[in-house]
């Protein structure tokens, strides 16, 4: 397996691996808030520059028409969200988006497709996208659903740096959100990605109605992998009208920060990414998340079908906080 790019390598030596239990993770969540943030910041400073944030840009290369029933997703054909199905983008169009992302300061370009998994007929186009984006000097990432056969090896040969496939939530809550594929299916794809020598990007979504134990359980699943993900995106649910989760109660903001802090402590050398939901966060809440150990964001005004802060707002926030790009 190839080593992670310099931007993703921790500055400090690797720490001994800890196998977490759900009980231990819950106890971590239950620490006094200030104690938890202090511990998370200590861990963060031991492995990363505390004032540096990695920036990724995410583009939907194929929108809508997905056969799966993920309860949070606007792109499922099983939900009445009013989203039209679109065809796979042309390679040249993707390259133009990637050039714009690089010009604005992104170091990684992520490409997402709404389907259960890529069909063979679409793979050559996706592989060409990876090769062309890589040639721009950007790190490449794709999120294509479940892989089969030698697709992971094909992506590796094309130059793919990262593959995103989130676990979404804890095992005991998973069936309340998704029924068309299992958590085991997701883990199988991640094993294929690891086996091909591609860096793993995997995290989850909070605020879907799960309890603290399930949030802790998600992090345990991630932290206890043979090799924890190099990138761990933590999404704060953005309820979409027409989906089963459109009326779910919002997670308490401090509980979201606790989740970030626990992720940092449990996966000390992983990049922890603030993902979906930043548009709804105040600058102050985001600052707390950075204090808790988040050191990566999605950069740009769109995340697949969800709004994201525009780059001007992010640049203003980074200036106020003294944060700089990786």
UniProtKB/Swiss-Prot annotation:
InterPro entries: Aldolase_TIM, BATS_dom, Biotin_synth/BioAB, Biotin_synthase, Elp3/MiaA/NifB-like_rSAM, rSAM. One of its GO terms (molecular function) is iron ion binding. Binds 1 [4Fe-4S] cluster. The cluster is coordinated with 3 cysteines and an exchangeable S-adenosyl-L-methionine. Binds 1 [2Fe-2S] cluster. The cluster is coordinated with 3 cysteines and 1 arginine. It holds the Pfam family BATS. Its EC number is 2.8.1.6. Pathway: Cofactor biosynthesis; biotin biosynthesis; biotin from 7,8-diaminononanoate: step 2/2. Transmembrane segments: none annotated. [2Fe-2S] cluster binds at residues 110, 141, 201, 273. [4Fe-4S] cluster binds at residues 66, 70, 73. Keywords: 2Fe-2S, 4Fe-4S, Biotin biosynthesis, Iron, Iron-sulfur, Metal-binding, S-adenosyl-L-methionine, Transferase. CDD domains: Radical_SAM. Its cofactor is [4Fe-4S] cluster; [2Fe-2S] cluster. Belongs to the radical SAM superfamily. Biotin synthase family. Catalyzes the conversion of dethiobiotin (DTB) to biotin by the insertion of a sulfur atom into dethiobiotin via a radical-based mechanism. Homodimer. This is Biotin synthase. It comes from Aromatoleum aromaticum (strain DSM 19018 / LMG 30748 / EbN1).
């Amino acid at each position: 397996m190839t080593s992670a790019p310099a931007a993703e390598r921790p500055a400090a030596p690797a720490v001994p691996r800890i196998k977490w239990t759900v009980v231990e993770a819950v106890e971590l969540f239950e620490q006094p808030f200030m104690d938890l943030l202090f511990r998370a910041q200590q861990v963060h400073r031991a492995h990363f520059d505390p004032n540096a944030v990695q920036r990724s840009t995410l583009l939907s290369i194929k929108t809508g028409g997905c056969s799966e029933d993920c309860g949070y997703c606007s792109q499922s054909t099983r939900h009445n969200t009013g989203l039209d199905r679109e065809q796979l983008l042309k390679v040249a169009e993707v390259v133009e988006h990637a050039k714009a992302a690089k010009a604005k300061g992104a170091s990684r370009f992520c490409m997402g497709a709404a389907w259960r998994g890529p069909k063979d007929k679409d793979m050559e186009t996706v592989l060409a996208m990876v090769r062309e984006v890589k040639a721009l000097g950007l790190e490449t990432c794709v999120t294509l659903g479940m892989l089969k056969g030698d697709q992971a090896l094909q992506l590796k040969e094309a130059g793919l740096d990262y593959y995103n496939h989130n676990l979404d939530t804890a095992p005991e809550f998973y069936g309340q959100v998704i029924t068309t594929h299992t958590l085991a299916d997701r883990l199988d794809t991640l094993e294929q990605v690891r086996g091909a020598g591609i860096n793993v990007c995997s995290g989850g979504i909070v605020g879907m109605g799960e309890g603290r134990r399930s949030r802790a359980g998600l992090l345990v699943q991630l932290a206890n992998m043979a090799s924890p993900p190099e990138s761990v995106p933590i999404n704060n649910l953005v309820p979409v009208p027409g989906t089963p989760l459109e009326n779910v109660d919002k997670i308490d903001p401090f509980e979201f920060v606790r989740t970030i802090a626990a992720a940092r402590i449990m996966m000390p050398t992983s990049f922890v990414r603030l993902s979906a939901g930043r548009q709804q966060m105040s600058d102050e809440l985001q600052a707390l998340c950075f204090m808790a150990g988040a050191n990566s964001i999605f950069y740009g005004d769109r995340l697949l079908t969800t709004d994201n802060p525009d780059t001007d707002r992010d640049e203003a926030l980074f200036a106020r906080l003294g944060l700089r790009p990786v």
